[in-house]
């Protein structure tokens, strides 16, 4: 018996599809499943034709849309192209930045250059406020109007994105380490080359800071908001 499932609104019926199935018991009727026969691909056999006194094998006919030269077949795989990230106009080499998030939040640092990945290479200097050479995204910094002349600061070409790549740790553990209850935290040892790079960059920046009277104290001071101060009303 058919169920009168009339429209109660535009595009909306009185009963849902499940309600109609439960009321009419249409799910009880078993439908015969039609199994489609599998297509058997016939093997391609070479065709031999007689031309005059001799015989010749006819080559298999290529597809109508197949390229005549195999070299023209191109891969459909997408090529990964790293687009250059545009840096804000307020951020230039020597600009003093305020870090907004992370371990060094609130610290004032000096921007050195933009790396190929789009991240900014910064330094404290380390001797002034404890911020070493590191990368940071421009969305996590505020550019101030204070600028330092870093034309005399030479950053080595080796200090790039690969310079800051993390070392892969081995996941395999020995039997003794697996069953040991005590876990000793190993202190990460800084490479001598990194220490030398930090000292060379810091020494050049410190020479520039000595020329300005309160610039070293300014970089040492941590940024924070006082009561009644709002960041959108401040001029950095």
Curated annotation (Swiss-Prot):
GO cellular component labels: cytosolic large ribosomal subunit; extracellular matrix
Cited InterPro entries: 60S_ribosomal_eL6, Rib_uL2_dom2, Ribosomal_eL6_CS, Ribosomal_eL6_KOW, Translation_prot_SH3-like_sf
SUPFAM superfamilies for the chain: Translation proteins SH3-like domain
Keywords recorded for this protein, A-Z: Ribonucleoprotein, Ribosomal protein
Disulfide bond positions: none
GO annotation, biological process: cytoplasmic translation
MF-aspect GO terms: RNA binding; structural constituent of ribosome
Family: Belongs to the eukaryotic ribosomal protein eL6 family.
Protein name as it appears in the record: Large ribosomal subunit protein eL6
Protein's gene: rpl6
């Amino acid at each position: 018996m058919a169920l009168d499932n009339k429209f109660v609104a535009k595009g909306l019926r009185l009963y849902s599809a499940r309600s109609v199935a439960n009321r009419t018991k249409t799910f009880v009727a078993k439908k015969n499943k039609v199994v489609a026969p599998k297509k058997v691909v016939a093997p391609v056999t070479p065709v031999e034709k007689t031309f005059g006194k001799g015989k010749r094998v006819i080559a298999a006919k290529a597809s109508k849309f197949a390229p005549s030269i195999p070299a023209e077949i191109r891969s459909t795989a997408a090529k990964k192209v790293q687009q250059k990230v545009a840096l804000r106009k307020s951020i230039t080499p020597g600009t003093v930045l305020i870090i907004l998030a992370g371990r060094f939040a609130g610290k004032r640092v000096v921007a050195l250059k933009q790396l190929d990945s789009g991240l900014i290479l910064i330094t404290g200097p380390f001797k002034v406020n404890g911020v070493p050479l590191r990368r940071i995204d421009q969305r996590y910094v505020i550019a101030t109007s204070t600028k330092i002349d870093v034309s005399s600061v030479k950053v080595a070409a080796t200090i790039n994105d690969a310079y800051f790549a993390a070392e892969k740790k081995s996941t395999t553990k020995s039997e003794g380490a697996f069953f040991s209850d005590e876990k000793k935290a190993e202190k990460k040892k800084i490479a001598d080359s990194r220490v030398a790079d930090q000292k060379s960059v810091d020494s050049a920046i410190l020479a520039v800071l000595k020329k300005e009277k309160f610039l070293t104290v300014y970089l040492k001071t941590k940024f924070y908001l006082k009561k009644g101060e709002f960041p959108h009303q401040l001029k950095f």
